[in-house]
């Protein structure tokens, strides 16, 4: 069954590939839209303390819906990640100075990373056949919350990390799977959700949508970590 990933993130591309299922990628900028979402989507959104427009599951739905509307692939997966600290949304930094400001706020503190997932399970409609309840897409929505604690960081350490360029395209201005992992002291919850795609939840949602033959998500997580040259964080044992 054909799977389309509605995301430009190379981290999500890589994580999904470790589940061993073939997929194609279609990218839109739909997550930035202000168009009202259907009532059935709004009422199905998981509870989240973020502002409505920033709700990661809503943004994931916008990505998946835009792709399905264009392509009507059998299964479309969308995801979006947002960082929150003290009630503030920390998205991707505008520039290096902004990244340094974000990391200064995060240093030595615990913040929450929210990753929303949307899966459309929609068989293509036959030519000339009107949409109906039988052909309407099945929709799955999910929100994963992980708590991340950064180590205390001095200005020189933050500046050196920002100079690598890694923080500039990442929510919260750090990449846990890259050099930014050295700044992390603890993860409570799904590690892969912090990267951008929680593998266990993704596996269950894709299975429900009819995708078969996937790698076990825990095995995929450990294989990915080994490929990265990493081990699970020991305190507490990090979940996939």
Predicted regions and their residues:
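N-terminal beta1-alpha1 ligand-phosphate binding loop
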Residues: 1-22
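Hydrophobic/basic alpha-helical segments enriched in Actinobacteria
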Residues: 2-3, 27-31, 72-74, 170
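Generic preference for hydrophobic
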Residues: 3-5, 25, 119, 148
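Cofactor-binding loop segments of dinucleotide-utilizing enzymes, especially the Rossmann-like FAD-
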Residues: 8, 28, 122
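Active-site-proximal loop->helix
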Residues: 18, 37-39
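Glycine-rich, phosphate-binding/catalytic loops in enzymes
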Residues: 21-24, 94-96
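A short beta-strand-loop structural module common to alpha/beta enzyme folds
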Residues: 22-36
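Anionic-ligand binding patches
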Residues: 42-240
């Amino acid at each position: 069954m054909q799977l389309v990933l509605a995301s430009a993130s190379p981290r999500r591309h890589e994580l999904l590939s470790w589940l061993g299922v073939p997929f194609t990628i279609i990218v839109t900028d739909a997550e930035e839209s202000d168009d009202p979402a259907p009532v059935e989507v709004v009422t199905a959104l998981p509870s989240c303390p973020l502002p409505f427009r920033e709700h990661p599951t809503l943004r994931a739905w916008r990505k998946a819906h835009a792709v399905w509307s264009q392509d009507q692939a059998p299964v479309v997966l969308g995801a979006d990640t947002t960082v929150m600290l003290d009630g503030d949304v920390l998205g991707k930094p505008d520039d290096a100075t902004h990244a340094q400001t974000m990391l200064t706020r995060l240093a030595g503190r615990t913040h929450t990373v929210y990753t929303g997932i949307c899966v459309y399970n929609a068989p293509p409609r036959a030519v000339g056949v009107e949409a109906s309840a039988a052909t309407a897409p099945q929709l799955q929505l999910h929100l994963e919350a992980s708590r991340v604690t950064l180590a205390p960081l001095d200005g020189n350490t933050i500046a050196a990390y920002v100079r690598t360029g890694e923080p500039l395209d990442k929510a919260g201005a750090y990449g846990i799977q890259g050099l930014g992992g050295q700044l992390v002291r603890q993860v409570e919850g799904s590690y892969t959700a912090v990267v951008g795609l929680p593998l266990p939840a993704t596996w269950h949602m894709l299975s429900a949508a009819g995708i078969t033959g996937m790698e076990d998500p825990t095995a995929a997580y450990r294989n990915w970590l080994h490929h990265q040259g990493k081990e699970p964080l020991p305190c507490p044992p990090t979940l996939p």
